[in-house]
């Protein structure tokens, strides 16, 4: 017998029981985005490889070790997108959306990184990202954070996430700090693990977010990035903190927060949780004022964030037992006897016409009435609509409330109004 073909490791199927909660969460996220005036943009899953090398940085872990890259039949190097910002910027430049314009954009979809699969971290994962172009001030940074805070409240998880902030300054300020940090690390190389030694010269700021406790203790005595910030970056960060204080958004300044992608400058932030174990970051982002020009456009201030949906779903399930997922089916049509099957089909169609938001399922494939009621219960229906030979002949329907067992017989013409009342 042929061996079953299974999903690729780290790339998961999401079954109907899973997608119901995903859809509910996504609808809340999209509603909030709409309320802030953001518009959806959809980009390809596959991009030219140089896009990510130029945007993310050739010596980052993402580019060096995690990208799914291949040559097409024309010999062109292509990559499954590992993140969404680079593609969004590319699309904005290509279609003339960015120059001398303000844009508030969002996107949602699968991303791909070759990582070791674990809870909340997969090789195919889903992100929702938001990007703002054309606004240089700290006020838009604050609005993005307020937007995310509104999400957490709507999802019932605000008390389980904490905001961490930092400013990594300008490119010139980071260059000066990088030199001082490398000099410090060279004096303590015996404390560094192999990963930190590898990063020490290629991407030394990433040593700051090492999970090694010995390295973290060493960094207590390292030069502080805040001491190297340019004056404009200091003022920008102070302005952001002031706005968050006025909006009563609690936060912690984490001077070791640097983010793993090279395009960031000034503001960086993360929403973290301790409710999911080691995988603590739920949402992260920051400012990337140089990226548009770096990818061939005109200099354009920009800021944004991305959120892993797998991790968000896990968090909602872990901490909000009251989170409600709408039933898949409101009403289930049960039929028995000659002529009842076609009558059931037509009844369901007429109810869909009368109540466009009604979720109604018709029993097909036969089965006695008891089995049909079992199917109605299994799909979570609130109401059963029963048609037998006598009901078909009399143009009537038996309407049964599956929660309390009460039932009544109505004329078919009255069923829509009764359902609207029962289902609210």
Curated annotation (Swiss-Prot):
It is an enzyme of class 6 (ligase). One of its GO terms (biological process) is histidyl-tRNA aminoacylation. It is found in: Cytoplasm. Its EC number is 6.1.1.21. One of its GO terms (molecular function) is histidine-tRNA ligase activity. InterPro entries: aa-tRNA-synth_II, aa-tRNA-synth_II/BPL/LPL, Anticodon-bd, Anticodon-bd_dom_sf, His-tRNA-ligase, HisRS-like_core, HisRS/HisZ, HisRS_anticodon. It catalyses: tRNA(His) + L-histidine + ATP = L-histidyl-tRNA(His) + AMP + diphosphate + H(+). Its main location: cytoplasm. One of its GO terms (cellular component) is cytoplasm. Keywords: Aminoacyl-tRNA synthetase, ATP-binding, Cytoplasm, Ligase, Nucleotide-binding, Protein biosynthesis. Pfam families: HGTP_anticodon (PF03129), tRNA-synt_His (PF13393). Homodimer. Belongs to the class-II aminoacyl-tRNA synthetase family. PANTHER family: HISTIDINE--TRNA LIGASE, MITOCHONDRIAL-RELATED, HISTIDYL-TRNA SYNTHETASE. This is Histidine--tRNA ligase. It comes from Yersinia pseudotuberculosis serotype O:1b (strain IP 31758). The lineage of its organism: Bacteria, Pseudomonadati, Pseudomonadota, Gammaproteobacteria, Enterobacterales.
